[in-house]
Amino acid sequence: MAFAEYEVLIARDAMTVYDFVVDGLNNPLWRSGIRSIKLLSGTTGRKGALYQQTLSGPGGRPIAADFEITEARPGAEVRFVVVAGPARPTGGYYLSTEGEATRLRFALRYEPKGLKRLLDGLIQSTMVDEVAQLEKLKAVIEALPASA
């Protein structure tokens, strides 16, 4: 099994951070490798929202990585599952208030089956890199105008 997590302290309130991460259309603003993304069905910010996402894979080939929001608790938690593509991890964003800031933790979990278990080390490394992109998310959110 591959597991990775990372956390940052963002100088914004929990609802500002939550509203940003629950909208999958914001992903290209902070995650690298996203070629395209659109809301396929459901409502942005709600459980059941399904996003069609294409990533840049090895050699620049497109890779499907569609995902569905499985839990959306305002100001507290967003969970998702990848429903298309070669790897289908589950993940979540977990928020907690610290003074006037928000601690955001991003966790990914993937249980490869069959021959994919042979790639566990590569998958683990990729997931570690993915969650570490929270540093860019922090910079993007903190660059937004603070709400009054």
Q: What do the predicted segments below correspond to?
A:
Residues 1-46, 148:
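Hydrophobic ligand-binding cavity/cleft-lining segments
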Residues 3, 48, 75-77, 99-103:
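A generic structural signal for beta-strand entry/edge sites
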Residues 3-5, 62-66, 87-92:
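Short, surface-exposed coil-to-beta transition loops
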Residues 11, 72-74, 98:
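Structural motif
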Residues 19-26, 124, 128, 139-143:
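Short, intrinsically disordered, mixed-charge
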Residues 38-84, 135-148:
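Glycine-rich portal/gate segments that line the openings of hydrophobic small-molecule binding cavities
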Residues 81-132, 137:
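Beta-strand/loop substructures that line and gate deep hydrophobic ligand-binding cavities in soluble
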